[in-house]
From Swiss-Prot:
Note: This parvalbumin has an isoelectric point of 4.45.
PANTHER family: EF-HAND DOMAIN-CONTAINING PROTEIN, PARVALBUMIN ALPHA
Domain EF-hand: 38-73, 77-109
N-acetylserine, modified sites: S1
Residues involved in Ca(2+) 1 binding: D51, D53, S55, Y57, E59, E62
UniProt record similarity statement: Belongs to the parvalbumin family.
GO cellular component term of the entry, any: cytoplasm
Organism phylogeny: Eukaryota, Metazoa, Chordata, Craniata, Vertebrata
Name of the protein described by the UniProt record: Parvalbumin alpha
Temperature dependence: Thermostable between pH 4.0-9.5. Average melting temperature (Tm) across all pH values is 68 degrees Celsius.
Entry binding sites for Ca(2+) 2: D90, D92, D94, K96, E101
GO MF, one example: calcium ion binding
Length: 109
């Protein structure tokens, strides 16, 4: 998404996606892509892109397509990667990730 590439360096995104080829780990992706260094406002903008249906949450289907938000050619996360990602970010147990949970995940890396 052009919104994401206006916030993150495209070269960092490419590097982060290459690291995900063998397996997705959100902490490694957040660090390599530069997400972990972004301000709350920038993270909120990226969250809005990831929240495809604009529900205010990133749900399981949106988590599966997480990498595709950064590059159309990226792969879909498998079920295990998706459930691990959800478990890491869903601090209140509602089976979705809110904007504050997303910001916390980014800053924990």
């Amino acid at each position: 998404s052009s919104k994401i590439t206006s916030i993150l360096n495209p070269a960092d995104i490419t590097k982060a996606l290459e690291q995900c080829a063998a397996g997705f780990h959100h902490t490694a992706f957040f660090k390599a892509s530069g997400l972990s260094k972004k301000s709350d406002a920038e993270l909120a903008e990226i969250f809005n892109v990831l929240d495809g249906d604009q529900s205010g949450y990133i749900e399981v289907e949106e988590l599966k397509n997480f990498l595709k938000c950064f590059s159309d050619g990226a792969r879909v996360l498998n079920d295990k990667e998706t459930s691990n990602f959800l478990a890491a970010g869903d601090s209140d147990g509602d089976h979705k990730i809110g904007v504050d949970e997303f910001k916390s995940m980014a800053k924990m890396t």
